[in-house]
Structures are given as C-alpha cells and as structure tokens.
A protein has these predicted regions:
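Amphipathic alpha-helical assembly segments used for oligomerization, scaffolding, or translocation
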Residues: 2-251
Length: 251
C-alpha cells in the first residue's frame, strides 16, 4: 500500500507539472497571439490615417508637377525648370504608400480601398518621367548650341551650333525624340533639322578644304572655282568662331 501510494503521489506530481507547463504554454501562445493582433491593428490604424494623407499628397504633387510645364496642356516645359526640382518631386512620388505591402499588411486587411491611389501614383510617375526625358533631351541639345533657345516651341535664326554638334550626337537625339508623337517632339525635331543642316555645311566645307590642301601645299583640287565655292559657303556658317577658323584655312 505504501508503494502504491508513493507511485500515486509521483503520478500526481507529474500530472501537476504537465498541467502547469501546459498552462504556461497556453498563456504564452495567447499572449503572442494577442500581441500579434494588437500590432496588426496598429498597422491597420496607421494605414487608414496614412492612406487619407497620401490622397492629399497626390493632389499636391500633381499640382507641383503641372508647374514644371509651360501651361495646362502638359506639353512644353516651363522655362525656369531645374533638374533639382524634378529629382525632389520624383523622390516624393516614389515614397508614396499606395500598396498593402507598404504597411506590412495583406490586401484583405487594409481598412480602405487603395486601388485608385495606386493608379494615381502611376500617373504621377508617368508624368515625372515625361518631364525628366524632355528636360534631359533639351539639355543635351542645348549643349550643342551657342545659346539656349528662348522659346522651345519654334526655331529661329538664333539657333547656332557650337563645336560639340556632330552628326552622331544629333542622330542619337533624333532617335530619342521620335519616340514621342507630340507638338513638343515636332518642335525639337525642327531644332535638330536646323542644327543638322549647319553641321553638314561645316563638314562639307572642312572636307572640301582638306582636299585642296596637303600640308603646306595646294592640291589639284585647289582651283579658283572650288576656292570661290567654298569661300561662299563659309559666309553661310552662323557660328563666328567656326567661320573664322574656316576662313583662316582658306587664306
């Protein structure tokens, strides 16, 4: 009987320990689950507030992007635009939270429908990409001109190439511009065409002079007729520095 009682006591102790451990595990599990629920609810509350704020941000950023265009047609860029403005707006647009993953949640846990916000963000990204591409092309074109155009909407006699203008550079820009089909691309193409005419004229004169001169001696190509022809062509070169260089070679 004593042995039997001793066994029963041990069994009771073991069962008690198991019960205590089980209770502790259950409490821990419930605590972890409760904490997880609380954290998720905090994320949901944060998402609800943020989503409403993001909608206001999108409206504000859209207005800021519109200011980088000359007018409401969103075609030509404003004259005072700077690269830093584009980068700052692009950064702010990329920071917009418009996906469930931005809040560490699944779509079904979002308190509000943000599908429209996602679409609006993509519209902003497309607009800033348009602005950035146009700005880059205009800057590259400007680097090949003596003076930046006062008006990108139409060419004028003020369009004068510098030494950076080459057939290759102009062709590369042309290939970038033709991807657009707009008033802006038509205008930029007109600039490129005028610049291309000037580059080809300069190349024609330079190549002609090269044929007439071999070191310090004249070649058989150096006739009075070819000299007069190239001299007349030189007068058509708009860039005074380039024109002077060609004239000195003909002297």
């Amino acid at each position: 009987m004593n042995n039997f009682g001793w066994v029963n006591m041990n069994l009771i102790k073991r069962v008690g320990c198991i019960a205590v451990i089980g209770s502790s595990l259950l409490i821990c599990f419930l605590g972890v689950r409760m904490n997880a629920e609380q954290r998720r609810q905090q994320k949901i509350d944060y998402a609800e507030i943020t989503i409403r704020n993001e909608a206001e941000k999108i409206t504000f950023l859209d207005k800021q992007l519109s200011k980088l265009y000359k007018d409401e047609t969103d075609e030509f860029l404003a004259e005072s635009i700077e690269e830093v403005q584009i980068k700052q707006l692009e950064s702010k647009i990329n920071q917009l939270k418009t996906e469930a993953s931005d809040f560490g949640l699944k779509s079904e846990h979002l308190p509000l429908d943000i599908s429209q916000l996602s679409k609006d963000k993509q519209v902003l990204l497309s607009k800033v990409a348009d602005i950035k591409t146009k700005y880059t092309i205009q800057q590259q074109l400007q680097e090949m001109l003596v003076q930046a155009p006062e008006n990108w909407e139409s060419t004028s006699d003020a369009v004068i190439i510098n030494e950076n203008a080459t057939v290759e550079n102009l062709l590369k820009l042309h290939n970038d511009v033709v991807q657009f089909n707009s008033l802006w691309s038509n205008s930029i193409s007109a600039f490129l065409n005028e610049m291309n005419v000037q580059v080809k004229l300069y190349n024609e004169i330079e190549q002609g002079i090269d044929k007439m001169i071999d070191g310090q001696a004249l070649t058989s190509e150096a006739t009075l007729e070819t000299f007069i022809h190239h001299f007349n062509l030189v007068t058509q070169v708009k860039n005074t520095t380039l024109r002077k260089g060609l004239s000195e070679r003909l002297e």
